[in-house]
């Protein structure tokens, strides 16, 4: 079984801090093309799943172009399961603009959510589980104590963000 893991792609980033408008536009296109190439490569290689561990986008205001390209890529590859954990830069940005989610797009929430990768069962009937949670200021202090995994499965845990520690 083959799985692709990625994070911090930051599609639709303004890139205005260090680049000219022309270079920023060029880089923005390159990022979207690279994401397309990754998905195409996955399909060609028989990848079962693509795990996106946060910050697929860089803004809450995703362009229609980027949203449609990503949605069409996901829908156009129904044999690949996409597991999308939103990060601190893309909360709700992609999914809020969709009238309905592609069937092969699996999302995580503020509580632990697990999905079993189909076709990965071992002799005991257990397979690969992809488990994740979107960290928030409200859950980040206690969520780790609530993780429960099946020891008979191969478990992949997906998180994004670092914990902010405050002194004083």
Descriptions of predicted regions:
Residues 49, 58-166:
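His/Asp/Glu-rich metal-coordinating catalytic cores
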Residues 1-69:
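N-terminal active-site segment of His-dependent metallophosphoesterases
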């Amino acid at each position: 079984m083959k799985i692709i893991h990625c994070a911090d792609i930051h599609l639709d980033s303004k890139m205005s801090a260090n680049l000219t408008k022309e270079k920023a536009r060029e880089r923005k296109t390159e990022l979207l093309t690279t994401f397309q190439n990754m998905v195409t490569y996955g399909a060609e290689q028989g990848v079962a799943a693509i795990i996106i561990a946060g910050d697929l986008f860089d803004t809450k205001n995703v362009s229609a172009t980027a949203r449609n390209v990503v949605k069409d890529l996901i829908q156009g590859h129904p044999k690949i399961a996409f597991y999308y954990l939103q990060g601190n830069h893309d909360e709700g940005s992609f999914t809020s603009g969709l009238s309905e989610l592609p069937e092969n797009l699996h999302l995580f929430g503020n509580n632990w959510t697990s999905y079993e990768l189909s076709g990965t069962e071992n002799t005991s009937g257990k397979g690969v589980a992809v488990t994740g949670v979107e960290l928030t200021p409200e859950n980040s202090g206690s969520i780790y104590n609530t993780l429960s995994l099946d020891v008979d499965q191969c478990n992949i845990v997906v998180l994004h963000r670092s914990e902010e520690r405050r002194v004083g």
